[in-house]
Design a protein with these regions (language model features):
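Bacterial N-terminal signal peptides that target proteins for export
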Residues: 1-8
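Conserved functional hotspot residues or short segments at active or partner-binding sites
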Residues: 426-432, 436-473
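PDZ/PDZ-like groove recognition
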Residues: 60-68, 76-83, 162-178, 182, ...
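Bacterial N-terminal signal peptides
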Residues: 8-16
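Terminal targeting/pro-maturation regions of precursor/exported proteins
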Residues: 19-141, 174-176
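Cleft-lining beta-strand/loop regions that shape enzyme active-site pockets
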Residues: 26, 30-34, 46, 50, ...
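PDZ/PDZ-like peptide-tail recognition elements
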Residues: 126, 137-180
Length: 473
């Protein structure tokens, strides 16, 4: 994923103003900012999406999305005239602007603000979402200011108010499985422990909270929807309180009240395993990940690490540059990834000569290892510097660019596809690990715990065998 620089955004905004005639814009109920965002999103999609865009579908998508949004918000009689695309994008942009203006004029008075978003912006956002949704690409989407801020929190290491735990929704038990607890964090202070199961938040059952996400058939999208719901209720302003109902070893505990604090969540955690095996877990490929990884590897090296296990399981990706930088810590030279634009132009990214001294390396992957994680996994596999352990990865072989907008929202558009150093296209295919190791769906284990994590056990066994081979030669 790439974030577009402000200068590029400024150029886009100048372009969008020219797309709508001055007389039309002056008579419109849309503000100049809304016009820029609406037309700019259309221009970006048609110019930068990695495949050819059906203009008629884009206009139809805007119209349908607005009508659906209005009906969902109790405007039962909402209707808008059909749009007819032409070969000229300026004409299409003007028609789109006119359609949204009509919707705002006719129906904005019937809506109320939502999360401080005005009715006219709600309708504009719905139109933008419809334009982007027309390409039927799950990764091309509109991000509201709240959603974009949440994305930045995860990727940029932004602090947030929270309870200081990592968790995974358990679809079988309809609870939240506590994966880890930040030392001296708010949850640690009230005695919450890894392996605890959260059954209710502020008196509302987790099963009830997660119900809206259960209709999603795709596992990763359902997990993302569940985590989005839960983070929305667990997070809040520092100093505010949240009440959790917790189960431990099958027994209900007394509900605990936790006071939220400012949480600084690292993207890299590390520890030394028995036998001097350095274990490094990456949760995301964010802005600070490469720096955090460098520090972790330096610390493990000073402790005498003989080999490394890099855990990319359930890492959904992040920034393209972070994937290149992380890969470069293990690959001394040569290609990391090749990115291909819609025009068919290939850009190859090479290792940056910052690699650590070679040591046996195992990389843990699973079905949720995706995007930037797969760039790193594919580069390590193709270069031969490490061995993948686990199950086949997700298969997200495309790159998204994020275009921020002035009101704090953004559009995320798939702008390119990528290939591994050996030219493999892993999109919708995934990457097969050399060593297959699975975890039964009903197994209750703590990932990263050498006493009960079969994939980690397999990875450690592999690197130990390589250490033994090096010793005997």
């Amino acid at each position: 994923m790439k974030r577009i620089a402000p200068v590029a955004l400024a150029a886009l905004l100048a372009l969008t103003v020219a797309r709508v005639p001055a007389a039309t814009a002056a008579s419109s109920p849309l503000s100049s900012l809304q016009t820029e965002e609406l037309v700019g999103s259309y221009v970006r999609l048609t110019a930068d999406f990695y495949k050819k865009v059906d203009r008629q579908a884009a206009l139809d998508g805007a119209r349908t999305s607005m009508i659906e949004y209005l009906k969902k918000h109790n405007v039962a009689n909402a209707s808008l005239p059909p749009l007819h695309a032409t070969a000229d994008d300026e004409t299409n942009a003007e028609a789109l602007h006119r359609e949204v203006s009509t919707a705002v004029t006719d129906y904005a008075p019937k809506l109320t603000p939502v999360d401080s978003i005005s009715p006219s912006s709600q309708i504009t956002y719905a139109a933008i979402a419809g334009v982007l949704g027309s390409v039927k690409d799950r990764y091309t989407t509109f991000l509201s200011p709240k959603e974009y801020a949440a994305l930045n929190e995860g990727l940029d290491g932004t602090s947030f108010g929270g309870v200081g735990i990592s968790y995974l929704p358990d679809d079988k038990t309809q609870t939240l499985h506590v994966e880890s607890v930040i030392l001296d964090g708010p949850s640690d202070k009230v005695g919450l422990q890894p392996e605890d199961a959260i059954t209710a938040i502020d008196g509302k059952a987790v099963s009830e909270l997660l119900a809206p996400a259960q209709t999603e058939k795709d596992d990763q999208r359902r997990l993302a929807a569940e985590q989005k719901i839960v983070s929305g209720v667990l997070r809040g302003n520092p100093g505010t309180k949240v009440r959790l109902t917790v189960q431990r070893n099958g027994k209900m505990l007394e509900p605990v009240t936790i006071t939220r604090e400012t949480i600084h969540a690292p993207s890299v955690t590390s520890k030394m395993l028995p036998g001097n095996i350095g274990y490094v877990d990456l949760s995301v490929f964010g802005q600070s990940t490469a720096t955090e990884l460098t520090a972790a590897l330096k610390r493990l090296d000073s402790q005498g690490a003989k080999a490394y296990v890099l855990d990319l399981r359930s890492n959904g990706g992040g920034y393209l540059n972070a994937a290149i930088d992380v890969s470069s810590k293990f690959i001394s030279s040569g290609p990391i990834v090749s990115v291909q634009s819609r025009a068919g132009v290939d850009t190859e990214y090479d290792a940056d000569n910052t690699a650590i001294a070679p040591r046996p390396l195992a990389v843990l992957v699973n079905q949720y290892t995706a995007s930037a994680s797969e760039i790193t996994a594919g580069a390590i596999q193709d270069s031969g510097v490490g061995t993948l352990v686990g199950v086949k990865t997700f298969g997200k072989g495309v790159v998204q660019s994020i275009f921020p907008m002035r009101d704090g929202s953004a559009v995320k558009i798939t702008t390119a596809r990528y290939f591994t150093p050996k030219g493999r296209d892993i999109n919708s295919v995934g990457i097969e690990p050399e060593i297959k190791s699975d975890i039964p769906k009903d197994a209750k284990i703590r990932l990263g715990d050498l006493s009960q994590d079969p994939q980690l056990i397999a990875a450690v066994s592999f690197v130990n065998s390589r250490i033994a081979q090096a010793t005997t030669h």
